[in-house]
């Protein structure tokens, strides 16, 4: 089965059009990034795509076609450089860019990808974090 997290990470990178932050200013992680790890990263922005601890859901459609649904977490982390409010604004711009990319095109090999849940908004003196759950569907 396709590694949905890796495909989504590459899809977001390839289609990122924001200039602030530009895609080269972002650390593109292929696993969850904890606050302690983020402090060690030299870049001020992280987009992390990873699979949560749930298995893919496979369903049988008509004529024996298998459909696989995979959930991928997309974490957006922004370091607080000037103020929490500024970092939150940047994080929301990055969130909107993820939504724009998913609405405009589907990652290669998948027929559907959409944000199904948003949670874990964190604002602290050091960072802001937002987690998005993306459902990705493909033929298995």
Model-identified regions with their sequence ranges:
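Generic low-polarity alpha-helical segments
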Residues: 8, 12, 46-51, 70-78, ...
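Intrinsic disorder/low-complexity detector
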Residues: 26, 39, 46-49, 59, ...
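Compositionally biased, intrinsically disordered low-complexity segments enriched
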Residues: 32-36, 72, 119, 135
């Amino acid at each position: 089965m396709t590694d949905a997290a890796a495909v989504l990470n590459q899809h977001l990178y390839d289609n990122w059009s924001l200039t602030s932050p530009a895609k080269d200013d972002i650390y593109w992680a292929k696993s969850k990034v904890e606050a302690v790890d983020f402090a060690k990263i030299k870049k001020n922005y992280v987009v992390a795509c990873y699979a949560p601890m749930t298995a893919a859901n496979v369903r049988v459609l008509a004529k024996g076609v298998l459909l696989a649904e995979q959930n991928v977490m997309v974490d957006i982390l922004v370091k607080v450089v000037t103020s929490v409010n500024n970092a939150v604004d940047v994080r929301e711009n990055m969130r909107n860019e993820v939504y724009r990319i998913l609405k405009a095109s589907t990652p290669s090999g998948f027929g559907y990808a959409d944000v199904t849940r948003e949670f874990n908004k964190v604002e602290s003196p050091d960072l802001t974090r937002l987690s998005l759950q993306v459902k990705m569907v493909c033929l298995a």
